[in-house]
Amino acid sequence: WGGAVMWRGTTRAKPIRTGASFVGLGTHHHRVVFYPISQPDADGLATINWIAEITMDNSAGWGNGDWNKKVAIDHFIHHFEGWNYDWIDIPGMLRGADAVYEYPMIDRDPVPSWVDWHVALLGDAAHAMYPTGSNGASQAIVDARVLGAAMVSKGVNGEALQLYNGTLCEPISAVVLRNRG
């Protein structure tokens, strides 16, 4: 655990600027990211996905076994009080969520191989990583496509699994390490 904790939620609100804008505010250690994930309704409100993140002292480790826990807004809102701008009220947006989930950013060291005999890992099982590039789900899709293409090319066998492993394991392990910051 590197000390980063994210809180995620969705809030019904008016989207800003183009209505499809992705906004990131803050620093690498204290930030908020938000963007709409729906079209505005008749009242002009869209579902806004948001992520609030801080990095704290990690010397004691993460003291909670949960990594996807529902929490009260008061648990973390104090980190974002005063983040009011003429075009967005960050504390108001965070408070507007029906549910908020806490995610300590925990990754795993890369493994030397994603394949063991006739078993292959893909997605987070192969390469759990910080969502620095917001690419976790996308990478799992890439894994599945590369694995599928290897099976089309080589058949459903160990040779296909080795092709998949040889294509992705080393370069994606490097991404895991880069995403640590």
What does each of the following model-derived ranges do?
Residues W1-W87:
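Conserved FAD-binding catalytic core of PHBH/FMO-like flavoproteins
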Residues E102-Y130:
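FAD-binding beta-loop-beta segment adjacent to the flavin cofactor pocket
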Residues P131-D143:
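A conserved FAD-binding loop/helix module that cradles the flavin
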Residues P112, T132-N135, A149-G181:
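C-terminal helical "tail/cap" subdomain of flavin- and related membrane-associated enzymes
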Residues E81-A99, N157-Q162:
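Acidic/histidine metal-binding catalytic segments
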